Design a protein with these regions (language model features):
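A structural signal for well-ordered alpha-helices, especially hydrophobic packing surfaces
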Residues: 23, 30, 37, 56, ...
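A generic "alpha-helical surface" signal
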Residues: 17-20, 24, 50, 57, ...
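Charged, amphipathic alpha-helical segments and their flanking helix caps
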Residues: 46, 53-64, 123-141, 146-150
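Disorder-to-helix initiation segments
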Residues: 1-22, 99, 103
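Helix-loop segments that flank and shape redox-cofactor active sites
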Residues: 7-14, 28-54, 118-132
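Acidic/histidine-rich alpha-helical segments that form the ligand environment
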Residues: 64, 68, 85-139
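Conserved alpha-helical segments that form or flank metal/cofactor-binding pockets of metalloenzymes
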Residues: 44-83
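Residue-level signal for pocket-adjacent positions within structured domains
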Residues: 2, 35, 40-46, 76-79, ...
Length: 156
C-alpha cells in the first residue's frame, strides 16, 4: 500500500537507503560489542562483561527501531549479513584481545556514528523534509553520545 505521510515520494527511497546504511553500521557495532562481551578477560572481566551486555542490548533495540522506521516509510529493511557488510561504514574486528583495545575500538565506532548521525539528521530535515526521521536519528545520536562518554570516562 502507498505511503502518504507528507514526505514527497521522491524522498522516501533516499531516506530508506540512509536508514539501511545506518542499520548495517549498527549491526556491525552490535556484533563487535557482543564479541567483546563473550571474549573479554582480565581483572575487569565482570565489570566489562556487564558493560558490553548493556551496550549490545541497547544496540539491539536501536537496530529494531531503525528497521521499523524504514518500514514506516514504505521500504524494506536490509536483513542479511552479506548486505550489512556490503554497505557498512564500520569495520569488523576479530583481533582485539585486550580490554583496552576493545574499549578504544568501540569508542571509535560510537564517535564515528555520532558524526554520521549529525550529518544524517541535517540531511533528513533539510533536504528530505522529514522531521520524524530527523527526530528519530537525534535520539539515536544521543544514545551514542552517552555510550561514548561512558567509554571515555572508563578509559580516563
Amino acid at each position: 500500500m502507498k505511503v502518504d505521510i507528507g514526505i514527497p515520494k521522491a524522498h522516501l527511497q533516499p531516506l530508506a537507503t540512509m536508514l539501511n546504511t545506518l542499520l548495517a553500521d549498527e549491526y556491525v557495532l552490535y556484533t563487535k560489542t557482543r564479541n567483546y562481551h563473550w571474549n573479554v578477560t582480565g581483572s575487569s572481566f565482570m565489570e566489562l562483561h556487564k558493560l558490553f551486555e548493556g551496550q549490545y542490548e541497547a544496540l539491539d533495540e536501536a537496530i529494531d527501531a531503525i528497521a521499523e522506521r524504514s518500514r514506516k516509510l514504505g521500504h524494506y529493511a536490509v536483513g542479511s549479513l552479506k548486505q550489512y557488510l556490503a554497505i557498512t561504514r564500520l569495520t569488523e574486528d576479530d583481533k582485539a584481545t585486550n580490554s583496552k583495545q576493545m574499549l578504544l575500538n568501540l569508542l571509535h565506532d560510537h564517535e564515528t556514528l555520532i558524526k554520521i548521525l549529525r550529518n544524517d539528521i541535517a540531511t533528513s530535515a533539510d533536504k528530505y523534509k522529514d522531521a520524524g526521521t530527523s527526530d528519530f536519528l537525534t535520539g539515536l545520536m544521543k544514545e551514542h553520545e552517552m555510550t561514548a562518554w561512558f567509554i571515555r570516562s572508563y578509559l580516563s
